[in-house]
Swiss-Prot record:
One of its GO terms (biological process) is dUTP catabolic process. SUPFAM superfamilies: dUTPase-like (SSF51283). Keywords: Hydrolase, Magnesium, Metal-binding, Nucleotide metabolism. It catalyses: dUTP + H2O = dUMP + diphosphate + H(+). Belongs to the dUTPase family. This is Deoxyuridine 5'-triphosphate nucleotidohydrolase. It is an enzyme of class 3 (hydrolase). The keyword Coiled coil does not apply.
Amino acid sequence: MTDTVDIPIIAKRLPVYAHPGDAGADLCAAEAVTLEPGERHTVPTGVSIALPEGYAAFVVPRSGLAMKHGLTIVNAPGTVDAGYRGEIRVTVLNTDRSMPYDIAVGDRIAQLIVMPVTRAVFVPVDTLPDSHRGTAGFGSSGYTVTQAGEHA
């Protein structure tokens, strides 16, 4: 069973989950925009929400737009805090080097994921406890997986 939370919303077009079990609800463009190659634009969605305390929403790219058209979101994920009451806007970037991309009113341009969040209490210390990974960062897990499931 999936938990639900009631979220007050002002929108001409409600975000919609495309399939049962989807994590993200589609956000649609409220304004037509043509993105030239390499151009970015902040697109209004016409959606404003009132998240309850203890929740945040995250605006993430749609995989089909990235794969088929080279469209991505510049600050993905975009964070919508519980106290924000303004319109959700999506800064979209056309990464294609030669083709412009037209966004029409009503086009699905991003997804909105609503999640409970935990607020951290940061505790200053002089040293951190050891871990298996330690300070190994970018690329430290390798690029291929062996038959046994180990990273090479």
